[in-house]
Amino acid sequence: MTAIEDIKQKIEIANVEAVKCINTADPVLVDIAPAGEVIPGLQDRMILHSGPPVDWQHMCGAQRGAMIGVVLFEAWAKNADEASKLLESGVIKFEPNHHYQAVGPMAGTISVSMPVWVVENRTFGNRAFCRQVEGRQQFGDYSDPALEGLRLWRDVWAPSLRKGILQMGGLPLKPIIAKALQMGDELHNRSVAASSLFANSLAGPMIEAGVVRDHLMSTLNYITNHELLFLGLSMAAGKASADPAAGIEYSTVVVAMARNGTEFGIRVSGLGDEWFTAPSPRVNGLYLPGYTENDAGADMGDSAITETVGWGGFVLCGATGILSLVGGTLEESMTCLLYTSDAADEEDS
């Protein structure tokens, strides 16, 4: 056996082990709690963000806006100008979510007071965390309505959901994921089925746990009308599933893909914690009339962890309902699937 053949064999063995780690994962939602109470190493005056490391000077506009929103949410500043100066001063520390077992959608900002989903991989004992998915602050909006949404999550919705989760002793996510994939979700841009299944699972336990009526009604209204609610859970489940596959010597399996609006980064199992980065691309998708790709910001978010474990774009042909939104066609989605299958066949040959 030549040296090259020996290395190739070691890579194949390592990759089988890495993929087995992902496939045998058992992600279970066990809690929702303030990030500062459950994320190891998260400190006051620290904000976690999506993608590879980035400093204030190199953050895109949406990422900066989201940071301002967090500072106002935490009451570290009284207004946006004060928040900007504080962020620029270096007093606030920026760290990637992936360095703290966490993920976040779009800007992905997480701070100490923000409740996060807590997902435990029962197979390996590791945990992963994800913040709330919402449509304002994570896109860079720091207006009063955006901040009010974060406060409702902190003060009403998360505590109510937590009581339900604890009442039922945790919620296994793999059965929901499996059902949703067969119901037209791909668990990244479409999680309608998964969100509905989740809402059905939590409604009864919240009532049994004695959630006060006003909070119960508000939370039920929230979870039954939030089609992307489960995205935060699929992201946390993906992170909890991928992390045990990291650190396997010789493995070439990608265990993280993430973007911060400036750079796109990946981490490879056998190469430790190093990030391999390139400029974050602009998405070739659908735009409102009068807008083009030139008006768009660069790609951002940790949600590509869903693709990392094989969901999202890799199962797009099974989620035809989302094709008109993302701008693709069934033929293109089938091409992606066939390419993935061909690559797997070549790996096995």
Give, region by region, the residue ranges found by the protein language model:
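Beta-strand segments within the central parallel beta-sheet cores of soluble alpha/beta enzyme folds
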Residues: 331-338
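Single conserved hydrophobic/aromatic residue that forms the stacking wall/gate
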Residues: 339-348
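Alpha-helical support elements that line or immediately flank enzyme active sites
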Residues: 316-328
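Intrinsically disordered, low-structural-confidence terminal and linker regions
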Residues: 1-19
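Structured, contiguous alpha/beta core segments that scaffold functional sites
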Residues: 112, 119-197
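An N-terminal, globular interaction/scaffold subdomain
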Residues: 24-146
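Accessory "access/gating" subregions that flank catalytic or transport cores
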Residues: 191-299
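Conserved phosphate/anionic-ligand binding catalytic regions in large, soluble enzymes, centered on
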Residues: 302-317
